[in-house]
Amino acid sequence: MVAAGAGVTQLLVLLLMVAAVPSRARGSGCRVGAAARGVGADGHEAEGCGTVALLLEHSFEIGDGANFQKRGSLLWNQQDGTLSATQRQLSEEERGRLRDVAAVNGLYRVRVPRRPGTLDGSEAGGHVSSFVPACSLVESHLSDQLTLHVDVAGNVVGLSVVVYPGGCRGSEVEDEDLELFNTSVHLRPPGTAPGPETAAFIERLEMEQAQKAKNPQEQKSFFAKYWMYIIPVVLFLMMSGAPDAGGQGGGGGGGSSR
């Protein structure tokens, strides 16, 4: 009996250990897996850890056409609401093309997919984009600020880009100042819209009605309130005007007899 009880105890301990192993593996798998493999540009690995990636693309072409190419990735940590960026260096050909576009007052465009964690345009539900004059980006030495606007469902609804200090003054820029982007990124969560003041209006209306019910005198018209003052004044005017009218009539008759 003692041996059987010891065997049952060992079996229970073994089962508890086996049950505890998967939970620890699941808790550490997100951290270890992400650290070992890194966060891919498609965001699928990061999505399981609460972080999604958005492919950041840019285009700078002479003319109205756009040819978007990868600039980097925006990493959105949905758990703590932070946003960071990883970006690649511009090649010599890209730096020259950016200068050419700036010389003709062309545009520099950026875009991200509407749905985080997707690459293909059809799966991403389209893109949101923004632009600045290419000359202002060149003269800012590639210093810009990206602001990502998202909704409550986690979709991207807007993207804005601002360069510092901004403006096109024709300043000379060294080629080495156009190699790396100096970017700050900000996440703009959905704001709480002010609700209608229906409840306050109804409450104020009920208070006014209750006040009128307590003071019914306030609901009377002007004449109903002050009739006792108006009638004596009218009677006084009528009585004071009657003798004057009689006197004027008598005087007129005497004049006609002559």
UniProtKB/Swiss-Prot annotation:
Upregulation: By glucose in pancreatic islets.
Any one of the GO CC terms: EMC complex
Keyword Amino-acid biosynthesis found: no
Tissue expression profile of the protein: Broadly expressed, with highest levels in pancreatic islets, testis and bladder. Present in the islets of Langerhans (at protein level).
Keywords, comma-separated and alphabetical: Angiogenesis, Endoplasmic reticulum, Glycoprotein, Membrane, Signal, Transmembrane, Transmembrane helix
Record has DNA repair as a keyword: no
Cytoplasmic topological segments: 243-258
Main location: endoplasmic reticulum
CDD domains: EMC10
Lumenal side: 26-221
Source taxon at top rank: Eukaryota
Subunit structure: Component of the ER membrane protein complex (EMC).
Protein name: ER membrane protein complex subunit 10
